[in-house]
Amino acid sequence: MAKAVRIHETGGPDALVFEDVEVGAPGPGEALLRQTAIGLNFIDVYFRAGLYPAPSLPATLGMEAAGVVEAVGEDVTDIEPGDRVTYAGALGAYAEARTVAADRLIKLPDDISDRQAAAMTLQGLTAQYLIRRTHRVAPGETILV
């Protein structure tokens, strides 16, 4: 069992519930993480309020975190137990532990803390997307990131 922040219905902050959840073994292509830091993002408010629909309810909120790989499922070759990793874009981060698709995981170098990784991964990927895909920044242009 792990503690998680979940919603059983959409709404305001009072919809958040802190409860025990069952965390199973990782399936093929998945990793089991012990999460040590979790990012807080405005998109989490959208899911809580129902502006972005969760795939099902109850739902565990949160889109990014960092932690330590505890176990891996079949066909996982790039990540192994003991690796420090971060990820973004996978709903369910507000939990002590969880399974996540291993191909979403990014190994962390020693000079980036778990807290730093959990606070910057989603924002960094968003900034990269905006300056590489939405508007290709040209030499001489000024941007604010």
How would you label these PLM feature ranges?
Residues 1-3:
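Extreme N-terminal starter segment of soluble prokaryotic enzymes
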Residues 84-145:
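NAD(P)H dinucleotide-binding glycine-rich loop of Rossmann-like/cofactor-binding domains
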Residues 22-39, 49-92:
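Glycine-rich beta-strand-centered segment in the early N-terminal region that forms part
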Residues 43-46:
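Cytochrome P450 core scaffold surrounding the K-helix E-X-X-R motif
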Residues 7-15:
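Extracellular beta-rich ligand/substrate-recognition surface
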Residues 17, 29, 63, 102, ...:
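Exposed loop/turn and edge beta-strand positions of beta-sandwich/beta-sheet ligand-binding modules
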